Amino acid sequence: MQLSKGLIDNPIKMGLLLEFNIAFPGEEPRTVEEYLKGGSREIILNVAAFLLGFKNHDSKYADNKELLKIFFGPTNNDFANELFKRINSLEKEGNRVGIIHPYSSLTLFEYFFKRPAEAQTQTDAEFEVNFLKAYLVLNSEYTAKQQKASDSTKDLVRDLAFPMLMFCMNYPVSDKQHYDINEIWITQVIKAKLLFEFLETQERTAVLYKAFLDFFEVKDWQEYLKSFLPLTLSMMKNENESHTDFHVPEGESFERACAFLDKLIVEDQEDLNEYDFLTLRSKPFYKVKDGVYRIIFNLFVVEKIFKGMYFFLREINDNLPEAQQVKALKSLVGDFFSEQVVLYDTIQTIFPDKCIKFSGQEIVQKGISGGPDYYVRKNHDIMVFESKDFLIPADAKMSFDFARYEDEFEKKLYFEVRDGKEKHVGVMQLIAFIRKLLTKDFSADTNYHYRDVSIFPIILVHDHQYNVPGFNTLINYWFQAELETLKEEGLYTAKVKPLVTINIDSLIYHQVGLRDSIPLNLVLGKFAEHIKKRTHLKFRDEDEMKAYVLSRQVAFSTFLNEYFKDQGLTKKPPIVELIAPTLFKDEQQ
């Protein structure tokens, strides 16, 4: 089975974001506040939520003509036509021009949500023009921030310079642009079920689990999900590209349902966290009126199913009496649960039989030190998994600065110097274990010849924000440097494949296909071939060279999606069979 040449399409597209000075050359921009002074706060929030309701791919409003139609009424028809001509002339030069961007829409919402309403003095025609100008000022603000990406990568070695430029330019907002909402919903629900079952059965989380139920006034986690999931489904079923309102049905449960939703809304004039929209992630609804709640951003609502649970739990845990608090909650959820529940469950699902496999816990029980989080050998392919559930600080994420990214990722995935000593993680853990494999020092599995097996080093991450072109390039660059030390030791490294970072959600989503149709080791082999550096290639110009390099930066999760799509083997997890028996257990009894 082979992929068609050029099939794997990179989600990061080369194009222009429409800025103020491009749309209005020669005009001095004013501030967002100045443009929208005298505008209706209610309308501004409504429009911001409307723009955030656009599809992140295949949107009809990707057509700028269609977009400008909804921005301007008949009075501003000439203005809109002139603007469209300017955009059209840019696109004829080969530049794809975009206007709407999640950074600008979210920033606009945050800015005006925390401001009090003021008297409306602008006419509708004035507001239409001024709103667009304010929005383009925010676009310009975003592209100005991207300059840091260029400045911080210009002196990197050749193999990293362009990949890291693209990574740094896109990483801060890629998770809010390049995603499949259906895939995220399914994987969030599956992981939420695992988390609740974990909390429910662990003695050390008993008090926290009960406090969570009390906070939401529900009897068990099943009732919580049955209250929360319909909020996400209302948005998933909305075929219109606009904001989604959730109307609480009138009846005897009206007050109770509103009380539940009131715990998920951002409050008027609330102090909003300035980095990565953390407050809106935590509270992705706002109240329009009694019984009517508006979704601010669809993605943030879906991520509340599981990803946002940790922040709920942390806040509730912090408010418990100190003696009842779960100690090291972050480690419990981010390390123990992510590895020994999510990772173990996923590997056991996609490799049910016909292979040799050991969990990290089983390796320890065999008295073997220095083992990986999971070991799988299928025929002549060895897969070595290290699980790393982490988020970097929000201000670092939004920095566009390679030096900050390198520092944060190095600590999480390579090594960290503490008290003059190196603490090895990720890459270094994999290198140490590969040394064991190549010297036949892993006693749990020795029935192979080291020259006959291919070794696939894998770092599993637990968030889709790392599905960014260039991320894997950096981590594999570190890995290849360390692999040279094994080669210098005289070890046979020719069949050690490039390191691959994999978002575990992609394995959860494709669990059926990986189990029944194409095993992970075969897809990893295809991916290794795809990203392989090829020398002596000739390009017509620099743009063609950059397009080629960019195509090799694709995240494994994107590659996996396209691979199954190309083979016609995409099969969603049986979500009803996985969730319904426990979610509706009371009704079945």
Where in the sequence are the language-model features?
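Long amphipathic alpha-helical coiled-coil/heptad-repeat bundle
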Residues: 1-233
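Catalytic core segments in nucleotide and nucleic-acid processing enzymes
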Residues: 321-539
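Intrinsic-disorder/low-complexity loop/linker signature
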Residues: 1, 10, 14-15, 21, ...
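Polar low-complexity intrinsically disordered regions
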Residues: 1-20, 24, 243, 379-380, ...
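C-terminal amphipathic "assembly/sorting" segment characterized by alternating charged
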Residues: 52-133, 138-139, 145, 381, ...
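Interfaces and regulatory segments of ATP-dependent nucleotide/adenylate/phosphodiester-chemistry enzymes
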Residues: 143-349, 477-589
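Hydrophobic transmembrane signal anchors and adjacent membrane-proximal interface regions, especially
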Residues: 3, 16-22, 184, 311, ...
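Residue-identity detector for glycine
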Residues: 6, 15, 26, 38-39, ...
